[in-house]
Amino acid sequence: MLLANMRPRNQLDVLDQCSEKKYVIADTMDIWISTERNELLALMTKVDLFVINESEAKLLTETKNLIVAGKKMMELGPNNVIIKTGEHGAMLFGKGDDEFFRTGAYPLESVADPTGAGDCFVGGIAGFIASIGQNSPSFNDLKASIARGTVMAS
């Protein structure tokens, strides 16, 4: 289930209405971090994968270091965290000390319009996870999903 970027209280309502939750991915944005922080923190305890961009990660965790930010978000409840770093790719954090992955973005000569690239990225991840039929994808599965998401966002 992909809880696309909307108010965290709405994401929680959608989650509560679904009886069969196989794998839950949530996306957010800076406005919800500022205006519905408590609801967002509650949501993070109920998701398998939390996806956030670089500036949002810094805002949520009140740190400028993305490694520290990723680790702090992992302590808030999700099984995995992805920090999107735009043209620089993404970072994946897992529960184990050795569960960290950094990938670059798919290289392009020119970008016409990056609008919606983050949504395409998350959609590519969700699509890959759904295609392998795993309720609990492995860390390697998530790494593969990021590769697909990166191509989708390009």
Task: Label every PLM stretch briefly.
Residues 19-23, 31-102:
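Conserved phosphate/ATP/ADP-binding segment of small-molecule kinases
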Residues 15:
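Histidine-anchored nucleotide/phosphate-binding helix
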Residues 66-154:
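Conserved phosphate-binding/catalytic region of the ribokinase-like
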Residues 7-12:
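Active-site-adjacent beta->alpha loops and helix N-cap segments on the catalytic face
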Residues 1-5:
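Short N-terminal targeting/anchoring amphipathic segment
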